């Protein structure tokens, strides 16, 4: 006998509240980032309860992939979530004239791009950067930025679109912060987290994009993730 429980609000709310606290307060403990052979899942989920012949109840949790999206990249081509199915993807949110954390985050992403190319060239890795200031980050501007940091555009897309669509994707899809702010550097308050997605576009980890140690953990976790069937 099976029962499917959709939108279990109490469990989901507790999970999301804990995650948001970690993200908003920046209380990531690198020691706690060590992983076993199986990485955790994050985000919304369904629980299916199964009752066996012996009356034993079992719960099977299914996590949702990130939401659908469609944005223009640095070459004015439409990119959707389907372009990342089957790949392990590193995702960040940035803007090209960001005066604070973005240059550091982009440099860390570029460093891992090179590290993967040299040490694991056959790994199905992709990189994805969403502009949180898309009203000024045109495809041409994104292309110049990507070239400036040495991005391999065969594996790394920089996306722009309607501001609210990107804010909603960050906040509702990735559970991360992104919104205009008069008090934030560059006029946008946004997360410093880099998200690790598995081949099914499910969120499997959050990392401090300004920390070499945290990004090295991401590198290790991506390799672990590549071994999942």
Region spans (language model):
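Short loop/turn microsegments at loop-to-beta-strand junctions
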Residues: 66-67, 89, 191-193
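Thiol-/selenol-based redox modules, centered on thioredoxin-like
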Residues: 180-229
């Amino acid at each position: 006998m099976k029962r499917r429980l959709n939108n279990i609000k109490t469990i989901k709310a507790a999970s999301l509240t804990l995650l948001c606290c970690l993200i908003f307060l920046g209380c990531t403990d690198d020691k706690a980032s060590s992983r076993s052979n199986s990485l955790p899942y994050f985000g919304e989920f369904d629980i299916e309860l199964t009752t066996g012949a012996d009356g034993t109840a079992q719960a099977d949790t299914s996590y949702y992939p990130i939401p659908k999206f469609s944005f223009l990249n640095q070459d004015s081509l439409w990119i959707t979530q389907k372009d990342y199915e089957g790949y392990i993807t590193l995702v960040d949110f940035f803007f090209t004239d960001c005066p604070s954390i973005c240059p550091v985050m982009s440099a860390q992403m570029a460093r891992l791009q090179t590290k993967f190319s040299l040490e694991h060239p056959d790994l199905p890795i992709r990189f994805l950067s969403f502009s949180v200031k898309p009203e000024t980050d045109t495809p041409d501007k994104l292309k110049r930025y990507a070239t400036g940091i040495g991005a391999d555009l065969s594996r790394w897309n920089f996306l722009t679109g309607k501001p609210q669509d990107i804010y909603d994707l960050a906040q509702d899809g990735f559970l991360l912060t992104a919104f205009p702010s008069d008090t934030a550097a560059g006029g946008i308050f946004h997360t410093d987290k880099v998200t690790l997605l598995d081949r099914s576009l499910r969120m499997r980890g959050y990392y401090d994009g300004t920390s070499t140690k945290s990004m090295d953990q991401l590198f290790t976790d991506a390799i672990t993730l590549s071994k999942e069937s």
